UniProtKB/Swiss-Prot annotation:
Coiled coil: 14-53
Keyword entries, A-Z: Chromatin regulator, Coiled coil, DNA damage, DNA repair, Nucleus, Transcription, Transcription regulation
Localization: Nucleus
GO process terms (BP): chromatin organization; DNA repair
Protein name: Chromatin modification-related protein EAF6
Family: Belongs to the EAF6 family.
Subunit structure: Component of the NuA4 histone acetyltransferase complex.
Region listing for Disordered, in residue ranges: 107-170
GO cellular component terms given for this protein: histone acetyltransferase complex; nucleus
Gene: EAF6
Amino acid sequence: MTDKEGQEVKDAPSIEQYTALKDQLTQQILKKQELDSKLSKLEDSIYEKENEYFNESVYGNIVKGFQNFTKTNTGGLNKRRITYTDDDHIFSLSSVNYIKTIMKRQGVNSNGGRNEDLDDYEDSIDPNNGNAGGNTPNTTGTNNQSASQANSNSNQSTPGRKRKIRTIDD
């Protein structure tokens, strides 16, 4: 397209560019959800391994020390179990996400007094058809849509943010 002076003018963003960007966003959201799921499973695995370590180390461990190691036990009657709290899980507590999860499970507000936590929102997409939040506008060219109609349709197909339903397992 050229203007009055014969210089080339760049086209305004087209439906094809919008669709390509929307598809790219959808793929990135799916990838983020997959990585979040893997991270959550890994953090749970680390927590379980810490519990196993605490339970199998009768004579002490690196966190609480080895005081029981040097003491001689009389027939195992004085074997004292060391009690562990969430504060002893030093590897789990090194993860910011895991700390937020624990705080949410305990009902503690972790967002500095704000009413809403932005982590409670998630990007919504339909992974079955790759559609981000709704129907895509008709791009076949057979319908003659005005710009305002295309804009109203594009608002529906933009990925939305919805509040997550929190459960104990989250």
